[in-house]
Every structure is written in structure tokens, then in C-alpha cells.
Regions:
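Acidic, low-complexity, intrinsically disordered peripheral segments
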Residues: 2-4, 26-28, 84, 415-439
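Bacterial N-terminal signal peptides
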Residues: 10-20
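Bacterial Sec-pathway N-terminal export signals of envelope proteins
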Residues: 23-79, 85, 106, 116, ...
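Periplasmic alpha-helical coiled-coil/stalk elements that build and connect Gram-negative outer-membrane
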Residues: 33, 144-259, 363, 367, ...
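Transmembrane beta-barrel architecture of outer-membrane proteins
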Residues: 37, 106-108, 153, 198, ...
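Small/polar (Gly/Ser/Thr/Ala-rich) solvent-exposed segments
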Residues: 50, 73-92, 103, 114-144, ...
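Amphipathic alpha-helical coiled-coil segments
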Residues: 51-66, 143, 147-167, 177, ...
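Membrane-embedded beta-strands of outer-membrane beta-barrel proteins
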Residues: 111-113, 316
Length: 439
């Protein structure tokens, strides 16, 4: 990343901070809100924040279910059955009797206990659940981080209007003083009533502008209040953040920073896919378990008996899905492709982020240059306005010409105030783009 005039921009950010904080003090009887606390309030009051704890609780329940797979499973069953034919002995006893008689109606009930000894899929499934939790929580944090940029926009919209109110208030105060002087001159016969009327009309127009600014600012503050869950009135001031040092450091290290939550989300997604591959492979491994059954029925284990008997049995079972026709390997290959897709998404995100950083840096440079001219323009407009004011008091120029110069000075102050806020906004936007907190 190319570094451009960081020291100059730092100086101008300090100037913007000082000037706009002064404008904020023009609003009496209110509280002061800073950008960092409002950003945090937006995150803290967003309903989606509770998803982090809900996801944790959900995963804990699922992990308990997975861990229960290691515990013995107990099954109780029973059945009654009638069959049309049964085994018969191939020969008879002397006298024509049968060696044994097998009943056609059978009854059986019992209790079965199964205990897993080895099952690789249990650990793999638990690891997959934890990886899914990390991915889901990273996605929630990414969503919540987007609130910071929304707060930035609402905050600086209101701050721009606040700064303009300060400039307009100074103009109204000056016009009120000029109107009083002109009325005195009219009373003394050294000025025409039309000149006083012209100044008064302009003063009323400026007061209209002030009321319009207040209404627009109330709307901006209302949006900011909704975003942050705070109660913000029009008497409250917005304190501009001092971002000079942070912006300077960020511009020097922007190429190496990976603070955006999206980077963590990409990493968690890759980890989840890797755990999913492990879980797929674990399904192919043999499973070993023991079993035992006790029961009562007719017949018992002696199938040639026609008496009700109790019985018991136990053993070891091995299960192995030895041949899956390549389905498991294809699934793992599909997951590997998904990892490559995630890598491509991350590369595209990094590219877009780089473009945004370049744009923010260019905006900082542009506003720094404009502010250097703004200061000179305002200084010249003040000189011209003061000179015209003195000549107007002497009756050399008309009220119309004086008001034209006053309007030009107001527009110059408006432009400077707007550029000062825009410079601070560009600094905050750069920090947010890089994933850094505004402090």
C-alpha cells in the first residue's frame, strides 16, 4: 500500500476534531456522544447478539447427545408369533412317538444391552459440531460488524449538520448585530429603510435555514438512536473522534492487517470443512461393541422345547462398511473443492477490500488538499466581508452588496465545516474497512 502524506492528514484530522467539537459545544443543555461508544451500543443492543449464547447452548446439547453414544443402550422388546410350519424330526421313536415337538405359537420378551467399545465417528462428530459452532459465531460477528459502518454514516451525517449549525449561528449573530446598527442609522437618517428591510429579510431566511438544519439533524439523530438503542435529543452533541494517530498507523500497515471478522469466518469455514472430511472418513472405520440379552419365552434358546424358559446370551460385534462404492472418497473430494471455493471467496474479498482502502486513502488525500484551500478561502472571505461591512457602515456600499459578501462567507464556512467532517468520516471509514475499532 502506498503511503500518502500521513502526517499532513493527521494534522488536518486534529483540526477537524477541534473545530467540530467546538461546534458541538454550541448546543446547550445536552449530553455528548462519541462514535466509539455509539458503535459499541449498536452491537450490544442488536437482537442478533444473543445468537452467540444461543448457538453455544445449542451445541452443548448436541455434544451431550453425541457423548451419550458412549453409554450403554438398553432396549426392551417382546413379541408373540404364530407360524404355519415348524421343524419336525426326521424319524420317530419306537411306538410312533415324536422325538420332540416344536410349538407353532411362540412368545418372547427380553432386555438387551449394547455397549460401544470403539467408534471413531463419535469423536469426529463432536469435533465437527464444535467447528460448526465456531463458524456460526464468526458469521454472527461478521453481521454485527456491519453495524459499525451504518453507525458511521448516521453519526457523520448528523455531525455535518451540527457543524453547519455552528457556522450558521455565527452568521445569524452577525446579521442581527448589523440589523441593529442599520436600524440606528435609519433612525438617524443616514440609511434607507430598504437597507434594513433587506438585512432583516436575509436574517429571517438564515433563521429558516437554521430551522431546516435542526429538523434534518433531528431526523439523522433519530436514525442514529434507532441503530444504537440510545435516547439522543437535538440538544445532545456528537463529539468527534481523535483519529489522527490511528489513521496514520493504519495507512502504514494496511497491507498486512487481517482484522476484519470476515477473515476469521473464512478460516472457521475451512476448519469446519476439514472436520467434515474427518467425520466422513471415520464412517468407514470398523465399529466394535458388546451386547447382552436376557429374556423369557417359549421356546427359550432350546428351539425344540415347548416350555416357557428364561435365557441369556452375550457377545462382541464388529461392524465395518468395507465397501461404499467410492461414495466416501467422492464426498471428501467434494469437500476439498468447497475449500477451494472458500479460498477464492477470500481472495475476492481481499481484492475488494484493497480497492476500498485505496479509495479511502485517496479521499483522505483529496480532503486534506481541499481543507488547505478552505482555510485560505475562509480567511479571504472574512477579510472581504469585514471590509464590506466597514464600508457599509460608512454608507459607501449598499446592504445588497454587504449581504452578498456575507452569503459568500457563509458558504465558505459551510464548505470548510463539511470537508472537516468528511475528513474525519473518511478516517473512521478507513479504520472500519480495515476492521479496526474507532477509539
Amino acid at each position: 500500500m502506498k503511503i500518502r502524506s500521513s502526517s499532513f492528514i493527521a494534522a488536518w484530522l486534529l483540526t477537524a476534531h477541534a473545530v467540530i467539537c467546538t461546534a458541538g459545544q454550541l448546543i446547550p443543555g445536552g449530553r455528548s456522544f462519541d462514535l466509539a461508544s455509539l458503535q459499541q451500543a449498536a452491537v450490544d443492543t442488536d437482537p442478533r447478539l444473543q445468537q452467540l449464547q444461543l448457538l453455544t447452548t445449542q451445541t452443548e446439547l448436541r455434544l451431550r447427545n453425541i457423548a451419550a453414544g458412549r453409554l450403554p443402550s438398553v432396549t426392551v422388546d417382546g413379541q408373540a408369533q404364530y407360524q404355519s410350519d415348524v421343524p419336525r424330526p426326521a424319524f420317530t421313536l419306537p411306538g410312533g412317538g415324536l422325538l420332540f415337538t416344536t410349538p407353532k405359537a411362540t412368545y418372547d420378551s427380553g432386555l438387551r444391552i449394547d455397549q460401544r467399545i470403539f467408534d471413531a465417528s463419535i469423536n469426529a462428530q463432536g469435533a465437527l459440531e464444535r467447528a460448526q459452532l465456531a463458524e456460526q459465531q464468526a458469521r454472527v460477528r461478521t453481521t454485527l460488524f456491519s453495524l459499525r459502518q451504518q453507525v458511521n454514516e448516521a453519526f457523520f451525517t448528523a455531525a455535518t449538520l451540527q457543524a453547519r449549525q455552528g457556522a450558521l449561528s455565527a452568521t445569524i449573530t452577525d446579521l442581527s448585530a448589523r440589523l441593529d446598527e442599520t436600524n440606528e442609522r435609519v433612525g438617524a437618517g443616514t440609511a434607507l429603510p430598504a437597507e434594513a428591510a433587506s438585512i432583516e429579510a436575509t436574517l429571517l431566511q438564515r433563521r429558516q435555514d437554521e430551522e431546516e438544519l435542526r429538523a434534518t439533524r433531528r431526523t439523522a439523530l433519530a436514525r442514529l438512536a434507532i441503530l444504537t438503542g440510545q435516547t439522543i435529543s437535538e440538544n445532545d452533541a456528537l463529539a468527534m473522534p481523535d483519529l489522527a494517530a490511528a489513521v496514520s498507523r493504519a495507512r502504514q500497515t494496511s497491507g498486512e492487517l487481517r482484522a476484519r471478522p470476515e477473515y476469521d469466518l473464512f478460516a472457521r469455514t475451512r476448519e469446519r470443512l476439514a472436520k467434515q472430511q474427518d467425520a466422513t472418513a471415520a464412517q468407514e472405520r470398523p465399529r466394535v461393541s458388546t451386547f447382552a440379552r436376557v429374556g423369557y419365552g417359549r421356546p427359550g434358546l432350546n428351539f425344540v422345547s415347548d416350555q416357557f424358559e428364561s435365557y441369556g446370551l452375550g457377545g462382541v460385534r464388529v461392524q465395518w462398511n468395507a465397501w461404499t462404492w467410492g461414495s466416501s472418497s467422492r464426498e471428501r473430494e467434494a469437500l476439498a473443492i468447497q475449500q477451494r471455493i472458500v479460498a477464492a471467496d477470500q481472495a475476492a474479498f481481499a481484492k475488494g477490500l484493497g480497492e476500498s482502502i485505496e479509495g479511502d486513502s485517496a479521499t483522505l488525500d483529496r480532503l486534506q488538499a481541499m481543507l488547505a484551500l478552505d482555510d485560505r478561502i475562509v480567511a479571504l472571505r472574512e477579510q472581504i466581508e469585514q471590509s464590506t461591512q466597514a464600508r457599509f457602515q460608512e454608507g459607501v456600499v449598499t446592504a445588497s452588496e454587504f449581504l452578498d459578501r456575507s452569503s459568500e462567507l457563509l458558504q465558505a464556512r459551510f464548505a470548510r465545516a463539511t470537508h472537516q467532517v468528511e475528513l474525519a468520516q473518511a478516517g473512521a471509514r478507513l479504520l472500519t474497512t480495515l476492521g479496526l475499532e474507532v477509539r
